[in-house]
Swiss-Prot record:
Residues 85-107, 158-198 are annotated as: Disordered. It comes from the Bacteria. Residues 167-176 have a biased composition (Low complexity). This is Uncharacterized protein MPN_687.
Length: 250
């Protein structure tokens, strides 16, 4: 089987053996470019990292590693704690003194502090119209200034005269008359319209109209008319009168 010249060249190049000098030079270059092995920490998180994470992101340093350079902190010597594990652990404090459940400052007997008699509160209205509560004891007997004892008398309440009920006055019933045939009187007796559009519809036409007012005072139709008037450059009043004339004719 014939081999082309290009393939034959690479085949012969691969079969050639390197000299000893070239092999030594290659080894020297490999030693110079040799990377130090990465010291794996105790808790290896390589399995937990993402697959697309690079090797540089996976490397992290710990103070427990011997390769960690403390720099200027080394001059402190043993005073500087080089590892988080070397911090002194706090021993649990065990006090031998008994715990005072009931302190002596607080009173334990509350019977002496409870008043035996109820305290009544009243309110005296002063000249400045402010009420200041005062505590008075009604069980206390008044000091006798004289031998005359004044008996407390209840105030006599006079009955308030109530007004006598007046008989209901019958109002005369107004007979409903038929609507006049005159158009002017008919317009005067009509109630005011529900919706008012000032300056657009004449009052007589608005009073005679029953369905057109509801038709074109709705927000949807009103917005349509405004947009149409703006696009065509025609006053809104002119468009509305045209619509009303068409409704009245129908």
């Amino acid at each position: 089987m014939a081999i082309s010249k290009k393939k034959r060249f690479f085949f012969d190049l691969a079969q050639d053996e390197d000299d000893a000098e070239t092999v030594q030079e290659v080894k020297k270059v490999e030693q110079q470019l040799k990377l130090e092995p990465v010291v794996q920490p105790q808790h290896d998180l390589t399995n937990q990292t993402k697959a697309n994470q690079s090797s540089q992101d996976r490397k992290f340093f710990s103070k427990d590693m011997p390769q960690f350079d403390f720099g200027p902190l080394l001059k402190f010597g043993d005073e500087f704690v080089k590892s988080f594990n070397q911090f002194p652990k706090q021993e649990p404090q065990t006090s031998t003194q008994p715990v005072n459940v009931q302190p002596q400052s607080e009173p334990t007997n509350f019977n002496n502090q409870v008043p035996t008699q109820p305290v009544h509160q009243t309110a005296e209205v002063h000249l400045n119209e402010f009420q200041q509560p005062t505590t008075t004891n009604f069980n206390q007997q008044p000091v006798a200034t004289s031998n005359i004892q004044v008996e407390a008398t209840q105030p006599i309440v006079e009955p308030v005269p109530q007004p006598e009920p007046q008989p209901a006055v019958e109002q005369p019933q107004v007979k409903q008359t038929t609507r006049p045939s005159n158009k002017l009187q008919e317009e005067e007796n009509l109630p005011p319209p529900k919706a008012k559009v000032p300056g657009i519809i004449p009052l007589e036409r608005q009073e005679r109209l029953t369905t057109g007012v509801h038709f074109y005072t709705s927000t949807r139709v009103w917005n349509k008319v405004k947009r149409y008037a703006k696009a065509v450059n025609i006053p809104i009043s002119r468009i509305l009168t045209m619509i009303l004339d068409q409704v009245i004719e129908e």
